Amino acid sequence: MADHEASKINHDNHLLLDQPLLRLPYELLRKNFRSAHFTVEKESTTLNKLLKETAKGSLDGKTSPEDVVKNLDTMIAKMRGMKRKLSTYANEETRLYKQLDARVAHLRELSDMHSVEDVKYEAWSRKRLDRLLVDYMLRHGYNTSAQALANEREMHDLVDVETFLTMSKIRESLENGSVTEALAWCNDNKKELRKLQSNLEFLLRCQQYIELLRINTPSKSVEAITHAKKYIAPFQEQYPDEVREMAALLAHRPTDKNLPLKYAAWYSPDRWTKLATSFVEAHNKLLGLPTFPLLHTALSSGLSALKTPACHGTQKTTSSSQPGHSQTSMTSTVCPICSIELNELAKNVPYAHHSKSHLDNDLLLLPNGRVYGQAKLDEYAAKAGLAEGQVKDLVTGEVYSRTALKKVFA
């Protein structure tokens, strides 16, 4: 009964991990619809205004036939332009719905499985691992490798390559000292960023201002003041302290001696890295993406199931080679949680909750403090070809007499 419960698939827990799989296409569909709606509203307003002016001028005789024809040509051109834009939005909507259908079908496959022993579960689990690996690589800039894996596994509709490629491009531009693409992204998502109370646009405008001051010439100083009046002053109510510091930077240039730390921080080259990080955080929050890669979440869950209070310790083991050769000492981890690859990730996860204990019968305590079941010691001694009355530690290889062993439970 216990084995059956352990092998049973918990569909709710799987869906918790795979929430972003459905959420991102949904958020992108909303964004696509808002963009299409804005285009229709904007172009319709312009067309209606021009149509009314043309009709009124034509009826009043104030507009010549040539101007009427010219206005009609302008309206036709605008309509064609709007049609092209709407076609682009329609194609994007079709792509996103196709993506969403594929992801729902992928999750529906899991709903038909009820045990990890199902032959189909291994293939499904492998596909999910591939998805998590692509997500991890895209988040860390390994775009070529991520695309290669997605192509090999034929799972383009299950991963968000285009979204992360766009994010990666803007992040790299910030790391290379350019705010142009990031500001364009902020302009496209102005309303949403305002709802999230994001300060990204303000930080980008401040960086533009700082770069003008860094040049430290009279013409650039005037340009910086003009920039501050237009783009930084409107944020005075939201970020009063930062705006005052921006004004003070006019009197504190990066070449000044004994530059106060708070002003030196604004001129630090590290600010580009911080801006890139701020952009990624705003991007993920806007699209409802997790802060950390889903691979970390999945690994943390598995690590927590294995972690015990004995973890993060090491045990020195001594292995002896053939007679006459020196002994070598090596340090091996007690469990996989303590391995170099997983140690850091496992540090902050909780310990496993075990409601049932599984102990061998007739536990025996070895002189080195290790405990094993008698059956295991007997089996290992037979395999090792030990003399009668001797046992061997399964980990360290140390040999002891049976008389030196103590029963754990009398």
Swiss-Prot record:
UniProt GO cellular component terms: cytoplasm; GID complex; nucleus
Record GO terms (molecular function): ubiquitin protein ligase activity; zinc ion binding
Zinc finger annotations (RING-Gid-type) as residue ranges: 335-396
InterPro entries noted in UniProt: CRA_dom, CTLH/CRA, CTLH_C, Fyv10_fam, LisH, ZF_RING_GID
Primary location: cytoplasm
Subcellular locations according to the entry: Cytoplasm; Nucleus
Presence of the UniProt keyword Secreted in the record: no
Domain of life: Eukaryota
Function comment: Involved in the proteasome-dependent degradation of fructose-1,6-bisphosphatase.
Full protein name: Protein fyv-10
Organism annotation: Neurospora crassa (strain ATCC 24698 / 74-OR23-1A / CBS 708.71 / DSM 1257 / FGSC 987)
Gene that this polypeptide is encoded by: fyv-10
